[in-house]
Amino acid sequence: ERKRVIIVGYRKDLGKVFTPPKPNLYKPTLKDAIWSLRLSKPALDKNYTNGDANLAAPNHEYMTGGFSTIYMSRNRVRSWEEPSFTIQAGGRHAPLHPKAPKMLFIEQNKRIFVPEQEHLYRRLTVRECARIQTFPDDFIFKYHNIADGYKMVGNAVAVEFARQLAQVIYKDIILSSDSVL
């Protein structure tokens, strides 16, 4: 949902003008991205990593701990059929897993978890956030504290987006000239 500005420029002597790839109008859903991921684990005490040997998939662990008043001021749950919220560079702000029901509106800027369903509310794992950012499952994030994993994923440019830009640049610069560099 957050807008981004990407600037691509070519040297004048190349005589090229960057034309961005056509936008993909399909918006992948949470089901598309993370449905197949199962058996997540909470982080260890103080949000230290479990280590990949103890996880069903690399980095498939989630931050534990409370939620701030600001976090609880909005619904943080999207359904399986919706695209994810923007992945931010911090685990405390990670979206909640779609298995949980939408948060209940109490009053302006105040929501709560559905009573007797609180056990369903957990943050997305680092791996789930990475999948949403289109990282392949064999890309391993190395960290001791899980907050650093969320930070790496949230600060990253989505892999598929970067790939599409790189393909255009490669075609324009590398494939169309013998001596570019």
Region spans (language model):
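S-adenosyl-L-methionine-dependent DNA methyltransferase catalytic core
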Residues: R4-L181
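Short acidic, glycine/serine/threonine-rich loops at helix termini
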Residues: E1
